[in-house]
Regions:
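Subtilisin-like peptidase catalytic core
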Residues: 1-44, 89, 107-115, 168-176, ...
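Hydrolase catalytic cores
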Residues: 1-3, 7-9, 33, 195-226, ...
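Subtilisin-like serine protease catalytic core
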Residues: 1-16, 30-33, 61, 76-78, ...
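Structural recognition of the beta-strand scaffold that forms the well-ordered cores
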Residues: 2-6, 28, 33-38, 60, ...
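Solvent-exposed, polar/charged alpha-helical surfaces in well-ordered, non-transmembrane soluble domains
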Residues: 18, 22-25, 29, 54-58, ...
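Sec/Tat-exported extracytoplasmic proteins
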Residues: 31, 36-39, 43, 60-63, ...
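Structured lumen-facing ectodomains of secretory-pathway proteins
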Residues: 63-66, 70-291, 305
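Zinc-dependent metallohydrolase catalytic domains
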Residues: 285-289, 356-376
Length: 376
């Protein structure tokens, strides 16, 4: 059975240490076999605060395997704002693995992209050739925005689809002054300004939806928590390659057409089987090698708030898969070798690491163990 420990409030972006400690204590008292921690803070150490470290050690002594997300910060030098006390590009130590996954008694889990994606999306409307299905990542739905698939039932769709306009630049307000986005879908490139600002600028320009083109081949979960209260535009992301397709079809006038699909499609991910770009690099400041393992965390279709389903990416999606594998291995050790408690727990991590498959880059070279740990 699952023990669900709620540590985040309805309107909180973080959890207090006291609440986390209470949840860990409850999990130990209730006899959990595995504890999954899909949370963390960038740039952790192998030992944390006394109370937190002691709680993790108590779990280990009780024979509980603890898995935690390695973090989604790439490295300490990527997107590093001033005043955050993180390393600079001149610092050799670029590790950003999150606490508590950095703790000695915790398995730190990196993220690998799913090979297949169940995605909603739209079809292009080329002047010649077959329409191409383009999948989208609908991050907006989890921030109170309308789902992209709601466009499939509107009048424009019944009349043959929607027009989209390629917004120059990165979607600043002055970029929108150079195009007519009124009643159209705004196609905007990622970069420089927040996703919420791009969406608000499109809303102000009269756009009916926003498609953000990533600057990489994969999807990321866009943070739209800062958009205006009255802005509920559908806001989705597509890959860099698909963005280039739409730009080419738009031609010199920057206008194109698309048809939103009401049916979800299973499509092969362009970056499937590769380490997720956001997955945090190790190791730790004391030269401990982290993360320990990698699991599928990129483009995972699962449950969301409000009884909905959707696709999300993050090491928080990878850690539960490793936790599930740990639970199955504990069961195997118990049923086959009558091994339980701390003895069984101590076998789980080395068994998983020694049987993991190294993940290869697109050129056939293995990713660094500082990125993938022992492998998938």
């Amino acid at each position: 059975q699952l023990l669900v420990m709620k540590v985040f409030g309805a309107s909180q972006d973080s959890a207090s240490e006291a609440v986390l400690l209470a949840a860990l204590e409850d999990a130990i008292l209730l006899g959990a076999d595995v504890i999954n921690l899909s949370l963390g803070m960038a740039v952790g150490f192998s030992s944390g605060g006394y109370a937190y470290t002691q709680a993790i050690e108590n779990a280990a002594e009780a024979g509980i395997v603890v898995c935690a997300a390695a973090g989604n910060d790439t490295s300490s030098t990527v997107g590093n704002a001033g005043g955050t006390d993180l390393g600079t590009t001149s610092n050799i130590d670029i590790g950003a693995v999150s606490d508590p996954s950095s703790l000695t008694q915790v398995m730190s889990i990196a993220s690998v992209n799913n090979n297949w994606v169940l995605a909603q999306g739209f079809f292009t409307s080329p002047s010649d050739g077959e329409p191409l299905f383009i999948p989208v990542s609908d991050s907006g739905a989890q921030f109170g925005h309308q789902s992209f698939e709601t466009l499939a039932g509107r009048d424009n769709e019944e009349k043959g689809g929607y027009e989209y306009v390629v917004v120059p630049g990165v979607g600043r307000s002055e970029d929108f002054s150079r195009v007519d986005a009124m009643g159209r879908i705004a196609l905007i490139w990622r970069g420089d300004i927040a996703f919420s600002e791009k969406c608000d600028n499109a809303f102000a320009a009269g756009a009916i939806a926003v498609i953000v083109c990533n600057t990489e081949s994969e999807f990321v979960t866009m943070d739209l928590s800062g958009t205006q209260v009255d802005n509920s535009l559908p806001c989705v992301m597509i890959s860099q390659e698909d963005g280039q397709v739409l730009v080419e079809e738009a031609g010199e006038d920057g206008m194109g057409a698309l048809t939103v699909s009401a049916q979800w499609q299973t499509v092969q991910a362009e970056d499937g089987g590769q380490l997720s770009s956001f997955s945090s690099w190790g190791g730790l400041p004391d030269l401990t090698l982290k993360p320990d393992l990698a699991a599928v965390g990129g483009n995972v279709y699962s449950t969301m708030d409000g009884g909905a389903y959707g696709t999300m990416s993050g090491t928080s999606m990878a850690a539960p898969q490793a936790s599930g594998m740990a639970a199955l291995l504990l069961q195997h050790l118990r049923e086959t070798y009558e091994m339980t408690g701390p003895e069984a727990r101590e076998r789980v991590q080395p068994l998983l690491m020694n049987t993991a498959a190294p993940v290869l880059q697109s050129d056939g070279v293995e990713y660094s163990p500082r990125k993938q740990g022992a492998g998938l």
